Amino acid sequence: MKVLKNYAYNLSYQLLVIVLPIITTPYVTRIFSSKDLGTYGYFNSIVTYFILLATLGVANYGTKEISAHRKDIRKNFWGIYTLQLIATILSLALYTLLCLFFPGMQNMVAYILGLSLISKGMDISWLFQGLEDFRRITARNTTVKVLGVISIFLFVKTPGDLYLYVFLLTFFELLGQLSMWLPARSYIGDPHFDLSYARIHLKPVILISSVVN
């Protein structure tokens, strides 16, 4: 029964992911020119490479470890998340240097998209996936995405709202990640960053990352 419920939650979310762009795309393309959307797409593609560095293979590895060691969730979580946080800080530092020293990156869209890196650094959905709590993940993602779409229709009105549009996309993504930390506290307790335990997880994370990529 639990497997069927998890499948239903995941299926409903995937349907939402398909439907929402169908709703927003005509509206967005009517407001912004192909050049504006191309600018967003270009910088977003660059940020994606830094996100890959920030996340490593943590999502896959973290899910596996949490699922396999449910009696020691707190220790495993903070060891893995410490690794994720270090990778995110490194990635964000490199992205900042790129924006500062490469003229082609000195664009407000590129700056705003830096929030996406921070957002991925806060992502702990792998904890709930390991616990097989797909209901919470689906509810969180659905709520945030719907609010994001509503905000676009409410606030994005003219071609001059491109920066606002990009900000809303990244802001609600970040809000969604932050919203998972409160329910996570019952499993992970207070923050406990553990460099020694993070080193233990480093090699398997890199191995999984190389296989996945």
Predicted features, each with a name:
Residues T29-L37, F101-V109, E132-R135, T142, ...:
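Membrane-interface helix-loop junctions in multi-pass transport and translocation proteins
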Residues Y49-L53, L97, F102-F128, P204-L207:
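Alpha-helical transmembrane segments of multi-pass membrane proteins
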Residues E65, R70, L117-N141:
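Membrane-interface junctions at transmembrane-helix termini in multi-pass inner-membrane proteins
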Residues V3, R135-T138, L162-L164, L169, ...:
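Interhelical loop/hinge segments that connect adjacent transmembrane helices in multipass membrane
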Residues N6-V17, F43, T48-C99:
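Membrane-water interface segments that mark the loop-to-transmembrane alpha-helix transition
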Residues K2-A59, G148-V149, L169, E173, ...:
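Signature of the first transmembrane helix
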Residues I22, P26, L53-L56, L92-L100, ...:
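Membrane-embedded alpha-helical segments of multi-pass transporters/permeases
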Residues F32-F43, A68-G79, L90-I118, T158-Y165:
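Membrane-interface helix-capping segments at transmembrane helix termini in multi-pass transporters
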